[in-house]
C-alpha cells in the first residue's frame, strides 16, 4: 500500500513516538546547505541497544547506533539522496529514503531545515520469511513550494532465498 501524507499529518503521527542518538552530542543548528535529521526508534519486544543504523549517501556508507532511548541524530547535505537502514537481530529491517533536493525551494529559501520521523522495528517472528519491498518511507521536498512530502510503502514480500551452488 502506497500513501502520500501531508507534513501536518506526519508531524502529528511522529509526535507520539519515543526518543535517542548516534553521537553523544546533538548536531549543531545547520546552515541552509545541510539538514538535521532526527529519528526515533521504537523496538517491539526489546530495546534499541543492538540496533545498527546505516546511512548511505552517494555510495558512501557510514553507520552508528542510537542512544539508550532509541534516538538517532545526524546531518545530511542538501541536494542529495540518502538511504537510511535500520537493522536489529531478530527484527525485520527497515529503510527510509530521504531526498534533500528542493529543500530550499519556495518560502524556505535560506532557512534552516530539519526532519523528524519515527521507525518501529517489529520482530521477524511476526512475519516469518518476509522483508519490506523497499524503503518504508520516502521523504522529499516539493519543487515549487519546498514543503516536505512523504510517501509510505509497507508492502512485505518473501525474502530472497540464499542457495548454495555446487559445481
Question: Language-model segments: which ranges?
Answer:
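A short, solvent-exposed loop/turn motif at the edges and junctions
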Residues: 85-102
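Compositionally biased low-complexity segments at domain edges in trafficked proteins
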Residues: 113-167
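Short Pro-Gly-centered beta-turn/loop motif in secreted/extracellular proteins
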Residues: 73-82, 89
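Boundary at the C-terminal end of the N-terminal hydrophobic targeting segment
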Residues: 20-28
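Structural motif
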Residues: 26, 32-51
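Short, acidic Ser/Thr/Gly-rich low-complexity loop/linker segments typical of extracellular
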Residues: 60-71
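Positively charged n-region of N-terminal signal peptides that target proteins for export
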Residues: 1-4
